[in-house]
Amino acid sequence: VNINNEIDKLRVALVKEHTASAPLSSYDKQFKYSYTTAVYKDIVFVSLNTSYGLWASEYITANHYYAYDYKTDSTLSDSQIAGLFGQDMGWVLKQVNSALAALGAEPVTGVDKIELFVNEDLKLVADAKTESVMGGDYSEILVLT
């Protein structure tokens, strides 16, 4: 399963960093890994957050989302996740841009800038990659239901 590969990559990276980090008195990096899970019917949702940075700088953050149907041994697409809530990706795009406007953020240009997941409260959540005023994209996490 794809999630096992991702978790194994993180484990290998942490072991490698740990091996190279002695002595700890001069270690200047921070690693943060966290995850949440939710189960709905036969589907397991996992949200994995990774953050890395030097003590004196900002973090580089990445979010990874998995929706695994263990009954069919398959992963769900964003449109399938939206379908669990009786919605389609057109509705998702409209809701995301409405929420971004309320926050004063730039709208996303298409559904390719959105990743869907289900949080531990079984709410449909969007990770929208919106344009930063400083350049580049950043994630805005939006609860849609």
Regions found by a protein language model. Give the residues of each.
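Sec/Tat-exported extracytoplasmic proteins
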Residues: 11-14, 18, 22, 72, ...
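Short aromatic loop motif centered on NTY/YTY
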Residues: 81-144
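Short, surface-exposed charged micro-motifs
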Residues: 34-36, 65-67, 113-115
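Extracellular/periplasmic catalytic domains that process cell-envelope and extracellular macromolecules
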Residues: 38-40, 59-60, 117-118
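Long, charged/polar, surface-exposed segments that mediate recognition or autoinhibition
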Residues: 43-53, 59-100
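Active-site acidic/histidine clusters and adjacent loop/turn architecture
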Residues: 1-46, 50, 122, 128-134, ...
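Residues that act as N-cap/strand-start positions at coil-to-secondary-structure junctions
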Residues: 29-31, 62, 108-110
